[in-house]
């Protein structure tokens, strides 16, 4: 079954109920939320989530396991001097996600900030992930493929697989972002060759969430600028291949394409992507 949705607002007064209603209004059957502003660590009490209302009204239409939580951008688990804060915050974030019954939390792997070689930053990330897993249960942390902007780590599949192998726990997996891997240099427009690459290198089985975005920039730009579907360099034909690929059935595919305060593309984009 295709699971297709988008990032939706998790905000007062209705929080979870409002987010899932927005998703259903867009024709989605999955969703992604931030449990607070993505730029900071401010969080409300779980008692304000309207979780019981969600259970009563919407849980039969979008199950908790089909709601993805995205960790905030400020968390850098690959920086040793900031890792204690990152671990403590992410443990609490996983616990908040557990309250809802979330299955997947997406995490940006971090930056080395020119403080360490890439390999050392990856090992710092491994250490942090192990500490988080020791203090949490159930939820799987999905490391997002990055565009390689600045000192971002994990802009290639090899590095993400290295981290996952070193952690050696089924609760660490991958979130594939189409804009990011395009900007990192992967030619996903040659979809069959790209898919073969994923299979041949044992990357396909690691993917548990997909962020489906077009890119404002050409391949290998390392810019990380999302575009609306078919309005960038990747184009609709390629992005539809991800949606209709049987290997990605039952994996939440999440749109993070640009929207404004007064306009959302998601209803139209979901309809367009689902069309055969």
Swiss-Prot record:
Cofactor: Zn(2+)
Enzyme class (EC, first level): hydrolase
GO molecular function, one term: phosphoric diester hydrolase activity
Alphabetical list of CDD domains matching this protein: AP2Ec
InterPro entries with a match to the protein in the record: AP_endonuc_2, AP_endonuc_F2_Zn_BS, Xyl_isomerase-like_sf, Xyl_isomerase-like_TIM-brl
Disulfides per UniProt: none
Positions contributing to Zn(2+) 3 binding: 180, 224, 226
Annotated Zn(2+) 1 binding sites: 70, 108, 144
Reaction it catalyzes: Endonucleolytic cleavage to 5'-phosphooligonucleotide end-products
Annotated positions binding Zn(2+) 2: 144, 177, 211, 256
Coiled-coil intervals: none
SUPFAM superfamilies: Xylose isomerase-like (SSF51658)
Keyword list, A-Z: DNA damage, DNA repair, Endonuclease, Hydrolase, Metal-binding, Nuclease, Zinc
Cofactor, free-text remark: Binds 3 Zn(2+) ions.
E.C. no: 3.1.21.2
Keyword Metal-binding part of the UniProt annotation: yes
A GO BP entry: base-excision repair
Protein's job: Endonuclease IV plays a role in DNA repair. It cleaves phosphodiester bonds at apurinic or apyrimidinic (AP) sites, generating a 3'-hydroxyl group and a 5'-terminal sugar phosphate.
Family: Belongs to the AP endonuclease 2 family.
Protein name from the UniProt record: Probable endonuclease 4
Organism: Metamycoplasma arthritidis (strain 158L3-1)
């Amino acid at each position: 079954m295709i699971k297709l949705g988008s990032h939706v607002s998790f905000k007062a007064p209705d929080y979870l109920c409002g987010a899932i209603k927005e998703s259903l209004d867009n024709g989605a059957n999955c969703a992604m939320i931030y449990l607070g502003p993505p730029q900071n660590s401010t969080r409300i009490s779980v008692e304000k989530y309207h979780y019981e209302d969600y259970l009563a009204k919407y849980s039969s239409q979008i199950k908790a396991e089909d709601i993805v939580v995205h960790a905030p951008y400020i968390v850098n688990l690959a920086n040793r001097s900031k890792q204690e804060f990152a671990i403590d915050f992410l443990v609490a974030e996983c616990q908040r996600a557990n309250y809802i019954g979330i299955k997947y939390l997406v995490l940006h792997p971090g930056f080395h900030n020119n403080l360490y070689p890439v390999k050392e930053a990856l090992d710092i990330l491994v250490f942090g992930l192990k500490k988080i897993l020791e203090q949490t249960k159930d939820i799987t942390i999905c490391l997002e493929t990055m565009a390689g902007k600045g000192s971002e780590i994990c802009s290639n599949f090899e590095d993400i697989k290295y981290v996952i192998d070193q952690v050696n726990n089924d609760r660490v997996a991958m979130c594939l972002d189409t804009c990011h891997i395009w900007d990192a240099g992967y030619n996903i427009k040659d979809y069959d060759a790209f898919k073969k690459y994923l299979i041949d290198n044992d990357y396909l089985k690691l993917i548990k969430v997909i962020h489906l975005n077009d890119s404002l920039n050409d391949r290998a730009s390392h810019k990380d600028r999302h575009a609306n579907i078919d309005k960038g360099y990747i184009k609709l034909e390629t992005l539809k291949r991800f949606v209709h690929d049987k290997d990605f059935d039952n994996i939440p595919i999440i749109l993070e394409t640009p929207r404004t305060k007064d306009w959302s593309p998601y209803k139209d984009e979901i309809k367009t992507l689902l069309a055969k």
